[in-house]
Amino acid sequence: MKPERVDLRGVANVDELVGRVLQTRLREARTLTVGLELRDKQSLHDFRIACKRLRYALERFQVLEPSLEQIADRLALLQDALGEAHDRDMLLSILPPTMPATERRLQTERAELVERSSALWSELERMMQALDSHRT
């Protein structure tokens, strides 16, 4: 999935630039939260990549707005959980059919990791809303 292009036309100052970049990356991630509902490999992977882009943008600008660091740190935890779920998907795809107990364990772990990811995203949404209300 390609990143959404950030429209910087008419940007007059650093605050506007930061706002446009973060709004674009956040919109991209929010659009792909459907992966948390669908729970399929590709949708979760796309959501993870969008979260990574958002995190990198936050890290880039945290020198200007230190409160972004906490959100970036939480996004890293979300990425880790989604990455672990992806690892379970890969293991399940190569697991021999003669290992049903291992398959059940991996499926359970994956489901728990996706649930954790969903909870982390909900927490992140609250953090980002608080940041938005603080900035306006």
What are these regions (language model features)?
Residues M1-T136:
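Function-determining surface determinants
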